[in-house]
Every structure is written in C-alpha cells, then in structure tokens.
C-alpha cells in the first residue's frame, strides 16, 4: 500500500513506496525477515507524530507499529505494547486507578516513542516509571527479542539508549502507583487543558520542538530574536 507522508502530523513530505501496519510481534519479525531477504530498505515508525519526511518520499517499506495489547504482571505493574498511543495508555491506567502516567497523556505519539526519547512533562518523565523494555536489534543478523532494565536504558533529558540505537521497541513494562480515580482523571484533564491553552493542538504540531536549555528558556530566546 502506498501512503502519503502528508497524512501524518506535519502534513508534508512525499510518498512511501510501500506502507504496512504491523499488529503483532510475529508480523514485525516477518517483515524484518522478508525485507532482508529481498534487499528492500525498511523504516519503522510509531504514530508519525515526530518525523519530517522529504518531498521525495521514502524508498522501500515504511512499517507502522500498531501493536495494542497489554498484560498485568501485578496490581501496579503491566507490560504494554509499544504501538499503544500515549492517550490510550493513560485511559487504560485511569480505568485501573493507577497514577504516574498523567504527564504523558497529551504527548502525541506512541509508548515506544515516549520510551525512546524519555518523554516528559510537568516534572515527570518516562525514566521514573519504566521497569524494562523488550526490543529487536536491527543491526544484529539474528532476529531475536532482547530485554533491558531501567538502568540499561541510560535515560537522560529527552534521551535513552534507543535514541542512538538501530532497534525497534516491542513493549515496555511500567510500574505505577495505586491512586484515586477521580484525582487521576482531574489531573489528566488539567494537563490537557494546559496543553490546549499553550499549544496549537488542532494544527500540525509535535508539541515541543526544541530541548530546554540548562540555564535558559528556549521560547524566550526565540521571542527575543523577533
């Protein structure tokens, strides 16, 4: 299936030669195996909410990760597929009165993308709730699922080991806290209202474009430039 990159968040860019949606680990593994066998380039994406595509498009196969299952390990710990949208994860956790993910509910994109960039907002970030992540190393000749713990993610500001690693995240295990459902929902609503007030969420936008400086506010510098 040919897919226009302009269908994604920024509404720009050329077509992908072949566009597929992958809904299981088996489909992910088979796609890697097949493209390697026939020598076709393969590019994985999440929700397409944090990428810019050139007008010439993308050669080869673009595979969108659409996995969407989750399993509880115990009352406050669960493993979630990387293809789940952050908004969906927030809803799942709200339904089970689990707190700790509210900060990410309005961040566009998938859980896999949030882990990759150590997404954060309102004083919280993914490194605070990630237990482990399973992934496939695309530089390895062998197609196998590996797992790393929290420390091995090498989390830092908007960065993880996956930022510079050619890998596809399969799923992530999160540990949350038992909370009050009403309070969690109120926090979710407040965070979303705050985003609506400060960001043009009805326009092509991926939220923040620039990293925060250590001793300056990026937005202030842009304003001062005129």
What residue ranges belong to the model's regions?
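Conserved active-site and cofactor/substrate-binding residues in soluble primary-metabolism enzymes
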Residues: 23-26, 84, 88, 124, ...
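A generic local secondary-structure boundary/capping motif
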Residues: 51, 90-93, 102-105, 118-125, ...
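Non-catalytic surface loops within mature trypsin-like serine protease
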Residues: 67, 82, 137, 176-178, ...
């Amino acid at each position: 299936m040919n897919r226009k990159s302009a269908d994604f968040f920024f509404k720009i860019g050329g077509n992908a030669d072949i566009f597929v949606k992958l809904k299981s680990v088996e489909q992910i593994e088979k796609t890697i195996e097949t493209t390697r066998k026939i020598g076709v380039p393969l590019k994985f994406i999440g929700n397409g909410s944090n990428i810019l595509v050139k007008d010439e498009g993308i050669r080869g196969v673009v595979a969108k990760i659409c996995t969407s299952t989750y399993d509880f390990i115990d009352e406050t710990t669960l493993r979630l597929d990387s293809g789940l949208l952050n908004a969906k994860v927030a809803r799942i956790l709200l339904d089970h009165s689990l707190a700790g993910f509210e900060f990410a509910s309005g961040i566009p994109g998938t859980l896999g993308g949030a882990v990759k960039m150590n997404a954060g907002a309102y004083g919280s970030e993914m490194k605070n709730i990630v237990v482990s992540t399973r992934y496939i190393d695309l530089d390895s000749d062998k197609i196998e699922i590996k797992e790393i713990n929290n420390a091995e993610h090498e989390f830092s500001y908007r960065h993880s080991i996956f930022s510079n690693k050619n890998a596809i995240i399969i799923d992530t295990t999160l540990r949350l806290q038992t909370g009050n459902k009403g309070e969690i929902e109120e926090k979710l609503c407040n965070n979303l209202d705050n985003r609506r007030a400060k960001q043009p969420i009805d326009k092509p936008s991926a939220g923040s474009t620039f990293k925060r400086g250590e001793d300056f506010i990026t937005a202030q510098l842009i304003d001062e430039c005129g």
